[in-house]
């Protein structure tokens, strides 16, 4: 080892207080490959301020009756899509999804805009009081998602802790059902998923399956009973109840 190596490894730090910053050449020396990997550019996390999972828990503790919607993305091919922006209305277990060709923060913000246009501003603010999502870069446009096109606040966005998808576990569980139709690793377009209409069909079948925790009712039935105005808006968009005997949770559902 050279003297430089010993100084960089900290051998002389205790004896003489010499560090690598005391080396004249160190300022201009290129970082070794291993060290370069350690000093990664810090990610801008300003959007998390006031929106952490702890902030979320505090807010719902103070406002226990608010409607929470969990949000995520589902996809198989990260480079070519398609990308599904999923929403779960927690109170009834209803799953909704929007089809995208891109997984960008602009696309996800546009997805929230579309959901608002489907429900209308008043119902959106009633039923999407909170959006809880993960820290994926596609969801980093917090302020844009929180505001309607007219600039007024429409919802509050909060983020799960890193590597804690279980904090929105009810949505993850719903993804399991969706994956019966859209298996991981499959070419989703080859399966027949080529647009919003195809996605609506898949979502309709998932939401029409009876759920034991709902007393054998489906999420669509429960939504119709408890929040008919929400049900009607989604019905008009193409999310429709399928007879229980005709529910298909298999990949061949979308075959033309």
Regions picked out by a protein language model, each given a short descriptive name:
Residues 1-192, 196-204, 208-211, 219-256:
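Secondary-structure boundary/capping micro-motif
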């Amino acid at each position: 080892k050279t003297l430089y190596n010993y100084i960089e490894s900290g051998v002389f730090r205790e004896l003489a207080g010499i560090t690598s910053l005391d080396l004249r050449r160190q300022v201009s020396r290129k970082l070794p490959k291993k060290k370069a990997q350690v000093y990664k550019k810090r990610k801008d996390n300003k959007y998390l301020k006031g929106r952490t999972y702890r902030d979320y828990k505090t807010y719902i503790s103070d406002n226990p009756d608010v409607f929470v919607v969990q949000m995520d993305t589902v996809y198989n091919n990260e480079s070519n899509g398609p990308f599904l922006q999923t929403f779960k209305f927690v109170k009834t277990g209803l799953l909704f999804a929007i089809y995208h060709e891109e997984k960008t923060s602009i696309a996800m913000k546009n997805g929230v805009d579309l959901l608002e246009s489907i429900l209308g501003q008043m119902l959106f603010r009633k039923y999407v009081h909170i959006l809880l999502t993960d820290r994926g870069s596609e969801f980093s446009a917090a302020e844009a998602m929180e505001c309607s096109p007219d600039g007024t606040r429409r919802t509050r966005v909060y983020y799960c802790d890193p590597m804690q998808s279980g904090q929105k576990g009810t949505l993850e569980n719903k993804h399991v059902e969706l994956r019966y139709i859209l298996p991981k690793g499959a070419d989703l377009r080859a399966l027949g998923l080529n647009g919003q209409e195809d996605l609506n069909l898949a979502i309709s079948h998932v939401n029409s399956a009876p759920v034991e925790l709902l007393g054998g009712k489906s999420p669509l039935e429960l939504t119709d009973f408890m929040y008919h105005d929400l049900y009607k808006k989604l019905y008009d968009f193409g999310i429709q109840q399928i007879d229980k005997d005709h529910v298909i949770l298999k990949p061949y559902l979308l075959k033309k």
